Structures are given as structure tokens and as C-alpha cells.
Amino acid sequence: MSINHFNNNKNNNNKNNKNNEENFWDNTQCNNDRNKFSIDNIINSNYPTANTTTITSTTNQTIQNNVLNSINIKNNESLKNIYYDENLQRKLTSINFLKNLCSVRDQPFNFNEHIKSIQSINSYRKCISNEIFKKNLINNQLSDILIIIEITSFIGDCIFEIFYLNYFQETLEKDILLFSNASETICIPSHHSPSPQFPVYYTENINNATPSTVVSNSPNNYSQPISPQSSQSTTPTIISSNSPLKTRNKNNNNNYNNNNNNNNNNNNNNNNNNNNSNNNNNNNNYFNNNKKNKIGDCNSNNSNNNNNNNHNNNNNNNNYNYNNNNNNNNNNNNNNNNNNNNNNNNNNNNNNNNNNNNNSNNNKNNNNINNNNNNNNNNNNNINNNNNNNSINNIINNNNNFNNNNINNNLFNNNSMNYNKKENYNWESSSSEEDNNNLIKEQSVKKNETVKKQYIPRKSKYVNYERIKKVSLSKSVEPFDTMKRMEKKKPGNCSMCNIKESISWIKTMVNGQLCNACGLKAIRQIKIEN
């Protein structure tokens, strides 16, 4: 689009000039052809400057009032009423100007057109800088304020499009070197440049300005919320509901074990760091003193701990409520733990480690235990958390834990690629022994069921049938549906998966070639090793 525009102007204005092709992109020609997109034209189309004769006293007074009012109002106002709504067309014009410049990005590769595009980019950079230099020479103070607003907003619209052009130019030079011998148009995949960061537009409250989403009219039609982070955003990993890495949290309160992908907070020495989704920077700890896990049943302990060692381990596997208070280094020696128990007693413990029982007993031990029962026994209902995090009783059933070494995040072992022949997997953690027994019964019943046999052709010493079965089951590919027979020929290399000796020449209805490893149809021009 932009190249055609420049070429049309070139042909209309310089028909008899033989050196148009060489001199078209110099500064002189650029200054002659840039009037439509110049900042002069853009600003004058919205606000008359001090040098124009068409300005009226009414318009000048209105502009003065708007500027002075915006300057005098310091809070809860912005400069939006001066330029944003009125100059929306100017913004669109500036974006379209750059859009036309770099529209060649979405076109097939063409050597000559890309060279012209790079030259036009460099020329228009000079044009923009010259216009900005001119506007800085204006002496009228009121016009200076308006022009600064106009130019600043114009640059805000253009500079990140130029960011695209910089990236595009770098990749373009590589393409030119790569396809320098090409004389015709070649279609190549388009380059995906990183999304730029746009400047924050003024909001109604300039003091509470928040990032907004700016939609650009560039060819890529990107839309990105403004953030101070890097322009190259990282895509979060999405784990599907059928993934073996996703375990359903049956306990409560979203307590995850980041080490073993299970819901137990008792198998690691670093439980106080990794087992809870609670933020350690929060000094408000909530304790469940009753057997019901409700918000209304929680009592807040507002003790200030500099070490943030207070963690809530709420595990409801067996309806046990654990209150683990590890106050290692408390600034306050008087830790007032207000427990709404049956005795309703307030105890002032001068020890750094407090044992809060329902009987309100003060035990000088190194363990903080909040027992809902009236016993200090270390039974299955209690957890002893030492200050050194050395001894932790494993109370939750080991059936809730998955061994990551057996799962390996895949159905196959990375070394031997042995297919796990279990027909069904229960990736959810069972919360009781009864669930495990039911699972064993279901699996035993399914093993006795008759399974429909898959058609397998006559055996060949060049075909690894176990590997074919494994891959076809994992990728839901059935490579033998259209097969009639197989010929014994020496295998070659697959062009899809690049695995040596994985191609066996197979005659199908379309006489194609089928890879035994990936189950895909390879390119027909593949060479067979002798």
C-alpha cells in the first residue's frame, strides 16, 4: 500500500526524470511527498496554530480556557478534555501512516519491495525528527503547550510501531541474505515480532491512572494490556484436566505440595515454605479451633512475627484440624493467643513456643500444638512441628501420595520408552482406604472384560510392532486402517520424526509411505538407505 502510494507520487511529479529510482528516497523527495502525513497537517486539522490566519478569537479563548482550567485543577482531572477525544482522528491518521509503511510485512517475500521498504523507513524517521525540530522553534506559549501535547501523543502512537519496524528490518536483512539469489516472489512464513508496550493514556483520575488496553490498527492487529514488564510475555503453562500432573485437591483451602504433586503437607522438611499456598508475608494467621472449617469459626491471631513462620496447615483428610504455630523469633515475648475454646481462658505465655490446648495448659515445650482434644498425646490427631523442622509425623495416608518417579510426567519412560500397559489411570488422589479398595476392584473387573483385538498385518522383521502399538495408542493414530500388505524392504529415515531406520515401505491404497515411529505419512521422495 505504502510502496504504491510512493510510486504513484513519483510517477506523477517526476515523469521525465530518469534518476527517479535512485533519488526517490533522499531527503528532498521525502520532504515533497510527506505533506499528507506531516505533523503540520495533522495538527492543523485539529487545532489551528499561532501562525495561521484562520484562527478566531472565540477559538483562541476556548483553547486558553481549556488549558488554564486543566492546569489549575490539580486533582481528579487530566488533560483528556484537551486532546484525546478531539484528536482521535489524528491518532488514527498517524497509526495508518505507519501501517502503510510497514504493510509489506504481511506480503510475500519480494527482494526489491523489501529494499524499498527499508529505505522508506529510514527516510521517514528523518522526516519525523525534522518536524519535531520545527515545532520546537515556535515561540507562542499557548501554542507550545498544545503542540507539545500533540507531538508527545503522536510520538506515543508512532514509536512502538517503529519498534516493530526495527525488529522487522533486522529479520528482513537476514531474509535478504538468505534469498538474495531469488528473482521471483517467494512465500515464506511471516516473522512473529514481540508485542510492544504502549504508553499509558490519561484516565479520568490522573493520580489513580491504571494501565489500559490499547488496540492498534497495525497489520498484526495486536491488543495488549499495558504493563511495566517485559514486552516478550511468557505464556503460562496450562495443564489440562486429563493431565497426570493435575491432582484434585480434596483437602481444603487450596493447600498444595509443590514438591511431590500431592496434597500432603507432612512429607517434607520444608513444609513451612512450600506446602501452603498462604503468603508468608502476611502476619494475620487464622486458626481453626473448631472441627468445622468455616470462616466464622476462625479466630485471628494478630501477633507480629518478623520471620513469618506462622503457617496454617488445614488438612481435612480425617476431619483433623491442625494448628501449627512456629513462632521462632518473636519480637514480643508476650504472645497472646486468644483461643475460643470451651474454657475461654486468655493465657500470656512468656515462651517463644506456646502449646495452646483446650484446657489452657501452659507447657514449656519446643512444639506448638493446638489440640482440639483435651490430651497432649502425640497420636494420629496431633502434629509435632519442631522449630528446626527436623521431625514431622506423617499422619496422612501414604495412599494420597504419588511417586513422581513412576509417573515421569508421561506415559513412557524417557530411556526405554516402555509402554505402561495399564488400561486406566486414576490421577486423582484417593482420600481414604475405601476409595483405593474400590479402585482395585474396578481395575480387576476391567481386566476380565474382553478387549477387541486390533488388526495386525503379517509380521516383518523390519517392523517393531510393539513400538507401533505404543505410538498409535499414545497419539490416537491407527496407521493400519488402509493397509493391504507390506513389502520387505530396507528401512530408511523418516522426514517427520528424523528417526533412523524407522521407515518401512508399506503399500496402502494411495501407495504412500508410513513411519513406524510417529505413525505419519512421510514424504514420497525419501531416500532409502542401501
Swiss-Prot record:
Q: Which top-rank group of organisms is this from?
A: Eukaryota
Q: Which UniProt keywords apply?
A: Metal-binding, Zinc, Zinc-finger
Q: Which GO terms describe its biological process?
A: regulation of DNA-templated transcription
| Disulfide cysteine pairs (residue numbers) | none
Q: Where are the transmembrane segments?
A: none
Keyword presence, Transcription regulation? no
For the region Disordered, what residue ranges are annotated?
Answer: 1-27, 212-386
Stated name of the protein: GATA zinc finger domain-containing protein 4
Q: Which organism is it from?
A: Dictyostelium discoideum
